């Protein structure tokens, strides 16, 4: 169940990448601690958002077991995470018209903070910003953020007419709140890009289970 401060915030799981560093395929379907990365992300985010929507390209049937609506990119040619964010914003505008904002996360981040939505929402409101992005360890994570639905036409123009692909090139146009999380005992935004990262995620998950 979501709290009263986050009930109206839909969540978008970005799984539209090509996973080149892992030899292709669906990176969020890789397994750690007996469950897929995607399952870990859903466990973390579902109590904070409603509904959850998955951005992925190709046959949506491969995600049927998760019971999520799957929205593909509308911009052709694997245009990157901005295309997935636009697909999510378009879905929210059509299916949750009362929602003013949407949270986006990478679907390969199994240790997302349980206060992600609450803190990003609070920062956006307190600082009166257009966007709020997560940060840790001195790095901003541009695909993990809170996006106003009203920016979707600006984003569409940036993608289609300006050929902008880098998330930070787009967000630099707006006032952004950056919210930082500690990296101890582990970075909550750790993501698995390589086989070595998967092994590290296994180790971190085992530590978390032991300390729970």
From Swiss-Prot:
Q: Which keywords fit this entry according to its UniProt record?
A: Cytoplasm, GTP-binding, Magnesium, Metal-binding, Molybdenum cofactor biosynthesis, Nucleotide-binding, Transferase
Residues bound to Mg(2+): 108
Query: What is the protein named?
Result: Molybdenum cofactor guanylyltransferase
Lineage summary: Bacteria, Pseudomonadati, Pseudomonadota, Alphaproteobacteria, Hyphomicrobiales
Q: Major place of localization?
A: cytoplasm
Q: Where does GTP bind?
A: 14-16, 27, 55, 73, 108
InterPro entries xrefs? MobA-like_NTP_Trfase (IPR025877), Molybde_CF_guanTrfase (IPR013482), Nucleotide-diphossugar_trans (IPR029044)
Task performed by this protein: Transfers a GMP moiety from GTP to Mo-molybdopterin (Mo-MPT) cofactor (Moco or molybdenum cofactor) to form Mo-molybdopterin guanine dinucleotide (Mo-MGD) cofactor.
Subunit description: Monomer.
Q: Where in the cell is it found?
A: Cytoplasm
- MF GO annotations: GTP binding; metal ion binding; molybdenum cofactor guanylyltransferase activity
Q: What is its EC number?
A: 2.7.7.77
Which PANTHER family does the UniProt entry name for this protein?
Answer: MOLYBDENUM COFACTOR GUANYLYLTRANSFERASE
Q: Which HAMAP family match?
A: MobA
Q: What is known of its domains?
A: The N-terminal domain determines nucleotide recognition and specific binding, while the C-terminal domain determines the specific binding to the target protein.
State the family named in the UniProt similarity comment for this chain: Belongs to the MobA family.
